[in-house]
């Protein structure tokens, strides 16, 4: 049984092997649940964050696969989510596979999910990411991998929680209320971010060129009723008096709006008009008839907290 944690007992430890010998790393891994926990524990135990992080990653694997050899746990720690550890363990016989072979297989897996995300993400998660990225969500690059981020008004806190629940598999690094000063006023918002993962590299490549988010047929072709519903929740606005929906697609240029207009006509039989305001912003507006058809397409996928986006009360 591991000794009680203390600064005195940790001073003699040297590197990862010392942490393995001194502590139950499975129990250590359970102590890190949110952003900041690793640093606090590192300071408490006087262990370098990088070394402690490696130990905690191994502990997570040993917690999921108690019978796995400890030498293989460090290799499998390259699989960042619990789900993919289980998928990987089912796909390969990890008990008899050599450590050298496992290194290659883990590297291969991380390359594969960057090309085919549905090896790991569910269709519902994929649709949420696609729909959100059509709106104001972003993919941020950090070193070689990326993370998924969004920010919503505090009025959409329930919607933010709903998204967070759907994406909990991807190790949430941030979910917090913030206040930002924009010009002479403050905006109260919810900021969300996952930890980095190779699978988000796929979405970065799909949506970005030269660090700018763009619209192209490849991404539009992935839109279905569920991802479209998320897009409407993020960027849609219902005009109550006249009964139509506007998509506030301000960050895209005219050619991209023409592409979106063509897509809606071909995929959903809708014919939005391209609007222009303030001398610089384009948007899409659905006429009353098309708005009714659009609502029929997406309503079953709209969270109740966002029913106002389609002109209904949030019951």
Annotate each PLM feature.
Residues 1-3, 314-315:
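Short, Lys/Arg-enriched, disordered terminal segments
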Residues 2-20:
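P-loop NTPase nucleotide-binding/switch module
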Residues 4-8, 28, 38, 112-123:
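General secondary-structure propensity
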Residues 16, 38, 85, 216, ...:
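Generic structural marker for isolated residues within well-ordered, non-membrane alpha-helices
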Residues 20-29:
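Short, Lys/Arg-enriched anionic-surface-contact patches
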Residues 31-40, 44-48, 55-113:
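Amphipathic alpha-helical oligomerization/scaffolding segments
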Residues 39-43, 50, 157, 161-165:
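N-terminal, well-ordered alpha-helical segments
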Residues 110-315:
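Internal intein/HINT superfamily modules and their associated LAGLIDADG
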């Amino acid at each position: 049984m591991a000794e009680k944690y203390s600064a005195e007992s940790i001073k003699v430890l040297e590197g990862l092997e010392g942490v393995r010998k001194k502590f139950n790393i499975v129990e250590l891994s359970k102590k890190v649940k949110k952003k900041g926990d690793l640093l606090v524990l590192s300071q408490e135990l006087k262990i370098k964050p990088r070394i402690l992080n490696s130990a905690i990653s191994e502990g997570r694997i040993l917690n999921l696969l108690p019978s796995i050899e400890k030498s293989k746990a460090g290799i499998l720690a390259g699989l960042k989510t619990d789900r993919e550890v289980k998928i990987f363990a089912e796909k390969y016989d990890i008990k008899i596979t050599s450590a050298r072979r496992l290194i290659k297989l883990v590297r291969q897996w991380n390359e594969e999910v960057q090309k085919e995300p549905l090896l790991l993400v569910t269709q519902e998660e994929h649709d949420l990411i696609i729909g959100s990225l059509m709106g104001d969500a972003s993919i941020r690059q950090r070193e070689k991998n990326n993370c998924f981020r969004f920010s919503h008004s505090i009025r959409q806190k329930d919607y933010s929680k709903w998204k967070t629940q759907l994406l909990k598999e991807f190790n949430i690094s941030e979910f917090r209320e913030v206040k930002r000063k924009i010009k002479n006023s403050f905006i109260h918002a919810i900021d969300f971010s996952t930890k980095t993962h190779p699978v988000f590299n796929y979405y970065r490549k799909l949506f970005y060129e030269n660090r700018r988010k763009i619209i192209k047929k490849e991404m539009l072709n992935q839109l279905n009723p569920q991802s479209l519903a998320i897009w409407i929740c993020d960027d849609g606005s219902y005009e109550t008096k006249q009964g139509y929906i506007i998509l506030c697609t301000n960050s895209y240029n005219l050619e991209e709006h023409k592409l979106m207009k063509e897509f809606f006509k071909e995929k959903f039989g809708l014919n939005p008009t391209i609007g222009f305001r303030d001398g610089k912003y384009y948007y899409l507006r659905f006429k009353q008839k098309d708005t009714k058809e659009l609502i029929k397409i997406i309503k079953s996928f709209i969270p109740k907290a966002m029913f106002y986006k389609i002109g209904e009360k949030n019951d």
